Amino acid sequence: MDLERIYRDAGAYLKGHFLLTSGNHSQFYLQSAKVLEYPQLAGRLADELARIIAAHGVEFDSVCSPALGGILAGYELARAAKKRFIFTERVDKVMTLRRGFEVKKGERFIVCEDIITTGGSALEAANIIKGLGGEVVGFAALANRGFCSLANLKNEAKSNCKLPSDVPLFALGNFEFEIYAPENCPLCASGSQAIKPGSRGN
């Protein structure tokens, strides 16, 4: 599966000067919403992701995604795997489980995002699940931005990956993009202003 071509064809492979959720800057951004707006394509991607997870022998009961970006990817993965789906969301900047969702003791979860960069939001969701007695048996995403190691593609993890090394991460593709701390951003140094994706039509 040529994930880069899928993102480019959907107009989801963006070039510019972007402020990422992590606070870092990047010249490239993957706007997964542009891919997931097509249900048939979203379903095909989720089917392949479910196949990869199953091929690695990871068994799970439910899928959890951090809102907002991970919801469609996680829901489609749960559909493909015929599992339950829940999501976490931020309330006053704190990741929380709401809306009557529950986690059973010993319930096995895949935490699914659309994109994994450093994995910070996915880790927050995982910590909520574990705090409620659940077990996180894997992480998944449509795309990995190259900082965390993938069980199915065997790339090397970088020091800023926040995901635990003993829990497998699965993705359909790996994108190696440079990211910069704001104070060391060459795009800022050239006079460009970082845009938060979604704030100006992106």
Curated annotation (Swiss-Prot):
Sorted UniProt keywords: Glycosyltransferase, Magnesium, Pyrimidine biosynthesis, Transferase
Catalyzed reactions: orotidine 5'-phosphate + diphosphate = orotate + 5-phospho-alpha-D-ribose 1-diphosphate
GO BP field: 'de novo' UMP biosynthetic process; pyrimidine nucleobase biosynthetic process
Family annotation (Pfam families): Pribosyltran (PF00156)
Cofactor requirement: Mg(2+)
UniProt: 5-phospho-alpha-D-ribose 1-diphosphate binding residues: 93, 113-121
Oligomeric form and interacting partners: Homodimer.
Protein name listed in UniProt: Orotate phosphoribosyltransferase
Species the sequence originates in: Campylobacter curvus (strain 525.92)
Taxonomic placement: Bacteria, Pseudomonadati, Campylobacterota, Epsilonproteobacteria, Campylobacterales
Gene assigned in the entry: pyrE
